[in-house]
């Protein structure tokens, strides 16, 4: 019974990791490949992701998160196939802790870079009158819409990664004895 429950947990984790992989990859591709060229005062200007450092960092962090989730998805597929062959308890505990720490780092990084890019986009959307920066989204509308879509996908990937880190924490604590075991002794 417990083995069947574990297999279903691995499948659920695999589905969520697949979704996070797709969301993070889509966010990275959408922001990384977004460009728009407009003529402003007889000068052709091209808006790219490299114009705003926070967007470039978002593209790289989302791509790294997608790669990490893909590797973890492959691990889930392997564990789903091998299911019965469990490694020794000590290496399993170390693997669980490693996955938890990596999941936490991925969640924090994805969330932080997405929020930083969103903050930079607010300046592009509203301008900064004290610094005499104009509203850029009035000029580069399509570029700003694509970046906004990337921010939504990045935030969904961050939320999914946070859920995965909670599942990883549950997996870590499963390797330790419960309080009832200590109370019985």
Swiss-Prot record:
Pfam families associated with the record: CASP_dom (PF04535)
Residue spans, topological domain Extracellular: 44-53, 126-146
Coiled coil feature spans: none
Highest taxon of source: Eukaryota
Residue ranges, Cytoplasmic side: 1-22, 75-104, 168-185
Bilayer topology annotation: Multi-pass membrane protein
Transmembrane segments annotated in the record for this chain: 23-43, 54-74, 105-125, 147-167
Subcellular location: Cell membrane
UniProt keywords, alphabetically: Cell membrane, Membrane, Transmembrane, Transmembrane helix
InterPro entries in alphabetical order: CASP/CASPL, CASP_dom
Keyword Transmembrane: yes
GO CC term (a single one): plasma membrane
Subunit organization: Homodimer and heterodimers.
Family: Belongs to the Casparian strip membrane proteins (CASP) family.
Protein name: CASP-like protein 2C2
